[in-house]
Amino acid sequence: MPTLDAIQINDTVIKQDGSEFSLWYNDTRYMCENINTMESLKELQSQIDIAKGHVVCTGLGFLLREEKLLEKEEVECVVVIEKNKDVIDMQRKLNPEIMDKLFIINDDANLYEGKCDTLLIDHFEDYEDNKLPIVTNCCKNIQHKQMLYWDIFADYKRYANYQELRKQFVTLPNFTPSQFYKYVERDES
């Protein structure tokens, strides 16, 4: 597992509260990860499971996804697009071994143009209400064969709704219902 620790570089801060880590820039929270919750583990696993070939990830975050991608045999290379240079510098300090294996591009993922087999989108602010315009833009600019974006299973908890979304984003995986619900956090009470 990557090293997670409270650290600050300029206006970018990683804060820790027990098993919860959050990434802040100019007092805006960009991500929060509780390393002990099933929801985040399922979401992470969905991206690992579909990844193959040349993988482009948007948003560097805490390297949880990237470390697992590097371990996967079907993944040839991992390119990460990260806009915030301070996040890149933090991870170089905390996790130099992982960072040395990644190809990091310091750029705005919303403007980046490229090509890959698997596109994994996760550069939203933490409380982003409407991710679809960002996803649409990245899918238009980065040619890819398949993609997922972070929190898709929180946004679309029903299989029928996910299938409707696939009409707009045809490169989303064509999960069977059982595959889909493997990643959805459901209240069983």
Q: Where are the predicted features?
A:
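Class I S-adenosylmethionine
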Residues: 1-52, 179, 187-188
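Short, well-ordered alpha-helical microsegments
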Residues: 44, 63-66, 88, 112-113
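Conserved class I S-adenosyl-L-methionine
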Residues: 52-62
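Conserved acidic residues
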Residues: 53, 76, 117
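Conserved SAM-binding loop of SAM-dependent methyltransferases across substrates and taxa
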Residues: 62-74
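Conserved SAM-binding motif I beta-strand of class I
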Residues: 77-82
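S-adenosyl-L-methionine
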Residues: 84-118, 123-127
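C-terminal substrate-binding/active-site "lid" region of AdoMet-derived donor-dependent transferases
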Residues: 125-189
